[in-house]
Amino acid sequence: MGKYEDMLIEHDYIEVIECDNLPKRLSGLWLGDMILINRNLPITSKLETLAEELAHNELTYGSIVDQSNFNHRKFEGYARRLAYEKLVPLKDIVKAFLQGIHNLYELANFFEVTESFVLQSITHYKRKFGHSTRYGKYVIQFEPLRVFEYKDIWILHIKGGGLLKNI
């Protein structure tokens, strides 16, 4: 079972219907207690759409379909960023690198999303944290994407009476 199916099971209190009659510009639509998802999307795009529509459930209220309204675009952005953080979390970026995953194609397969979604997630994290961030004992650098284990380095300060000093 993949992440899309897992997410459907986790949120089984919400009816998710895959349909053919959504407008071309919409991959999914939140309708209060129901989510419609375009049936013709690949499974990776369905997962991305489901995560974003679930984020709308958490963050927004009412209809925000009219994207000419500034506040509607703002709420759309909030939901998209939450979807990035749910589907490509920092802890799993570390996990992927520890498993030897080092290129975009492998990362997209690891997260079960499109390569474009991985790139958008990394861009989101760069905007949120800057060039890099710490996660536990790791440093995640966003461009180029790399993960390093962070270690404190202690040196012996001989002249000062043999004290250990953290640098």
Residue positions per predicted region:
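Active-site hotspot residues in diverse enzymes, especially metal/ion-binding acidic/histidine motifs
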Residues: 1-167
